[in-house]
Amino acid sequence: MQVAVIHTAFEDTPRTVAFVDVPEEISAFGTTDECLEYAYRWTNNIMGSWSRNDIEDNGDYNPNVTVMAPLNEGGMGLRSTSMGDQMLIGNKKYEVAMCGFEEV
């Protein structure tokens, strides 16, 4: 299963920043929320930069994440996915809520 991550919370226009390929052991046996949680985790900057693969010891790099947006000026990585951003699975759109996800 693939999840499209769309940053909308702080942008003037929505911007697709990543496609996240959810591993089969999660997508085949898990819930939709577990797939969304996987995409959320791996598009957050916790121990490095999720959007950069050129950093040594980058705990946030995941080869299952395809970055779709250009990096920020100066090569700075993209921001973390936040409340108000959206995720798309197939034709269903979800918004990152204060706690979990809400279908929109």
Segments predicted by a language model, with ranges:
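N-terminal non-globular leader segments, chiefly Sec-dependent signal peptides
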Residues: M1-N64
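Feature targets compositionally biased, intrinsically disordered low-complexity regions
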Residues: F29, M47, N58, E73-M76, ...
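Short alpha-helix capping/helix-loop boundary micro-motifs
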Residues: N64-G77
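Short, compact, well-ordered microdomains
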Residues: M76-V104
